[in-house]
């Protein structure tokens, strides 16, 4: 299945149904009171995280999703039916962003987590609501309010503990194959990896971590060179980054310069990502003697002024790979992921009584000409129907 990690869709919540103007008409009751019902609320739009999905390909071609409109009110005090909600399933790790305002609406990081992204409109009021002692036959009603509509940007960000960085052909996919059961494509040409992939590295019988491999970066990737830097977003949720460096590049480039290229592109993308713990891992030491590899690495880190720990491995032969995975596991256990507590639902600020009061103040007449069944001569709220003559 094709990997799609971004999608732009149109979301439309349902409009609220309009109120109804109606009067009770039955046998022997030719002039009954008002009986127009309220409209129904519009349907909402939700996102729900589904662990069985791993791509946003479902939203590549189908771009518009609309919830059902609330039905209008009817006579006999019948309230309109509420519009049906729609729920869109997305992979775990999806972020929802308002395309116009760039506001982050929420992150779905757990299976089954649900996010309201468009609220349906509220119902209009029927003329029964406007009945009073001085207005026995109201012809006012209110219209339903529009539902929320927005262009929604969906971004899938993989959930991994460890993220791999490096130039093309640094050996990232080979490392993934060495530490996990994942089988990403490996070849001797650049950009063998075209989409992110995940692998589960097991350390012992009861410990493991998830590692993410992304396509390699090249110089000026932030300006669109190569595959660009768009895949770096998949590393934002990682706890540690592994910067894999080819100690003996085939193009005879300087490994120190190659490290600087990745560092620069990382800062160009996000300072927050660049501030994550990052380990230098020198790969392909099997292409030279141990003494030569050690001397070359020491010369590189001295030029860079790098003072943190670094590692020398061969992903192809597995040399020192087990030691590295144990160190990674120990680091992850010492720095557990900050668990995001489920926030309590916001208190509902919407009050029906307030809404009804405001709606009644902005009511519209069914007819252009105002009409009621009271005459200007009414005295103390009593309409004079017949007055008997003199003696």
UniProtKB/Swiss-Prot annotation:
Its EC number is 3.6.5.-. Pfam families: GTP1_OBG, MMR_HSR1. Residues 363-391 are annotated as: Disordered. It comes from the Bacteria. Its main location: cytoplasm. Its cofactor is Mg(2+). Gene3D superfamilies: GTP1/OBG domain, P-loop containing nucleotide triphosphate hydrolases. It is found in: Cytoplasm. Keywords: Cytoplasm, GTP-binding, Hydrolase, Magnesium, Metal-binding, Nucleotide-binding. One of its GO terms (molecular function) is GTPase activity. Belongs to the TRAFAC class OBG-HflX-like GTPase superfamily. OBG GTPase family. This is GTPase Obg. It comes from Actinobacillus succinogenes (strain ATCC 55618 / DSM 22257 / CCUG 43843 / 130Z).
């Amino acid at each position: 299945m094709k990997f799609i990690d971004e999608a732009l869709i149109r979301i439309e919540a349902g409009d609220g149904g309009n109120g109804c103007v109606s009067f009770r008409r039955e046998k022997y009751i030719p002039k009954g009171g008002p009986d127009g019902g309220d409209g129904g609320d519009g349907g909402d739009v939700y996102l729900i995280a589904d662990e069985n999905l791993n791509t946003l390909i479902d939203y590549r071609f189908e771009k518009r999703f609309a919830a059902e409109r609330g039905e209008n009110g009817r006579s006999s005090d019948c309230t309109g039916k509420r519009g049906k909600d729609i729920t869109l399933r997305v992979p775990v790790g999806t972020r929802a962003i308002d395309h116009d305002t760039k506001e982050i609406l929420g992150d779905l990081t757990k299976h089954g987590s649900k996010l309201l992204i468009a609220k349906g409109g509220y119902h209009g009021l029927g003329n029964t609501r406007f009945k009073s002692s001085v207005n026995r036959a109201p012809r006012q009603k209110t219209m339903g309010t529009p539902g929320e509509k927005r262009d929604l940007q969906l971004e899938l960000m993989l959930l991994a503990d460890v993220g791999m960085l490096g130039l093309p052909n640094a050996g990232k996919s080979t490392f993934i194959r060495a530490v996990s059961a994942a089988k990403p494509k490996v070849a001797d040409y650049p950009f063998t990896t075209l989409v992110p992939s995940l692998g589960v590295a097991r350390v012992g019988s009861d410990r493991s971590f998830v590692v993410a491999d992304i396509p390699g970066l090249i110089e000026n990737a932030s300006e669109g060179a190569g595959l660009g830097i768009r895949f770096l977003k998949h590393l934002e949720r990682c706890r540690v980054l592994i910067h894999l460096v080819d100690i003996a590049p085939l193009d005879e480039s300087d490994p120190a310069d190659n490290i600087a290229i990745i560092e620069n592109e990382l800062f160009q993308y996000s300072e927050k990502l660049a501030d994550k713990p990052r380990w230098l891992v020198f790969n392909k030491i099997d292409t030279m003697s141990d003494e030569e590899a050690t001397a070359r690495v020491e010369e590189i880190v001295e030029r860079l002024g790098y003072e943190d720990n670094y590692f020398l491995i061969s992903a192809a032969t597995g040399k020192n790979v087990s030691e590295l995975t144990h160190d990674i596991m120990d680091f992850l256990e010492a720095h557990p992921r900050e668990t995001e507590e489920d926030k309590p639902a916001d208190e509902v600020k919407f009050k029906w009584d307030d809404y009804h009061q405001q709606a009644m103040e902005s009511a519209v007449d069914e007819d252009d000409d105002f009409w009621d069944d009271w005459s200007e001569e009414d005295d103390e709220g009593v309409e004079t129907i017949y007055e008997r003559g003199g003696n």
